[in-house]
Regions:
Chain B
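Electrostatic cytochrome c docking/interface patches
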Residues: 25-63
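Short cysteine/histidine-rich zinc-coordinating motifs and their immediately flanking basic loops
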Residues: 82-89
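Bacterial N-terminal signal peptides that target proteins for export
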Residues: 1-8
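N-terminal signal peptide c-region/cleavage motif recognized by signal peptidases
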Residues: 12, 18-20
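Solvent-exposed, acidic/flexible segments
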Residues: 41-49, 63-67, 101, 105, ...
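Short microdomains enriched in Cys/His and/or Lys/Arg
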Residues: 91-106
């Protein structure tokens, strides 16, 4: 049997490429991180700052975060044991190297999970993406904190962190 | 007639009971603070919304640097929304503006616990909590 190898190969290539694009489009590009959907996690992790998407950090980071709530970036953010277990389970199963892997591949590139980084804003990729933001903009009264994603990313609460 | 009156009672009593159950958590909170305040100071003479208002606006500067006062995060006007250092909007603290507030005692305990430490650098006394809450309930 004579197979038309070249057209078939080209066809497959085109198919693979569009599948890749389609997957990206569905995920909203590399700047989409699904927002927290669990009401307990939204309440407990989203009162002082935006409830950061679990896919922005590896599971090791969330584990460490939850074990250090007494000094949570200077605040005592302890919760009762049952709530803590609930939050830990959610964060760790949706983390950037577990359930949320498909959203985090770029953000966590170059991040060592064994180091369990606590600050999203110290991830190599995050720093690179925000290099062009001038110091005065960080100090602006409507920004003030690098944890204030929403100040510049108006879609942050819906999971979109595109360039604005 | 008699059965009608009975029917009315059947409707009215549960309605009254549920109304008081809805109002009770805030009163229970205040009663609890009052009992503690009396224990702390036998001369305790009740709570004052005016004292609570002064407390709300006072700059303590004994806790965290960026939160010297309640109004560092909550608005100066309790009926307006506040904002945390990380930019999160906080619903108004006045009951009239946020009618669901202060109904869950565990939540009230949690936030007094955290916020007093961050603003005053210590736990609030029962007198302080009762005064502040009285102010917010009156607003």
């Amino acid at each position: 049997m004579d197979l038309p190898y070249r057209p078939v190969a080209l066809g497959l290539l085109a198919l693979a490429f569009s599948a890749l694009v389609w997957q990206r489009a569905q995920a909203g590009g590399s700047h989409y991180f699904p927002p927290v959907s669990d009401p307990v996690v939204v309440e407990e992790c989203g009162s002082c700052h935006l409830a950061f998407p679990p896919s922005m950090l590896p599971a090791s980071s969330w584990k460490r975060m939850m074990s250090e709530l007494k000094n949570h970036f200077g605040d005592d953010a302890r919760v009762d044991a049952a709530t803590a277990t609930h939050i830990s389970d959610y964060l760790m199963s949706n983390a950037g190297d577990t359930g949320g892997r498909r959203y985090s591949d770029k953000l966590l590139r170059g991040t060592s999970t064994s180091k369990a980084p606590l600050r999203i804003t110290e991830l190599e990729r995050w720093v690179g993406e925000h290099r062009e933001v001038p110091a005065w903009e960080w100090r602006h009264k409507d920004v003030r904190s690098k944890a204030n994603c929403l100040a510049c990313h108006s879609g942050a609460e819906r999971g979109y962190y595109d360039d604005d | 007639m008699k059965s009608q009156a009975g029917l009315l009672l059947l409707i009215a009593v549960p309605a009254m009971a549920s109304a008081s159950a809805l109002a009770a958590p805030r009163e229970d909170l205040l009663a609890g603070y009052a009992a503690q305040a009396k224990q702390d100071d036998p001369g305790f003479a009740g709570f004052s919304a005016a004292r609570g208002e002064a407390f709300h606006r006072r700059s303590f500067g004994r806790g965290k640097v960026d939160t010297p006062a309640c109004t560092s995060c909550h608005a100066d006007d309790p009926r307006a929304a506040g904002k945390t250092p990380a930019g999160k909007i906080i619903d108004p603290v006045a009951l009239s503006a946020s009618p669901s507030r202060y109904a869950d005692p565990a939540k009230v305990r949690k936030w007094f616990g955290r916020n007093c430490k961050e603003v005053l650098g210590r736990a609030c006394t029962a007198q302080e909590k009762g005064d502040w809450l009285s102010f917010m309930l009156s607003q």
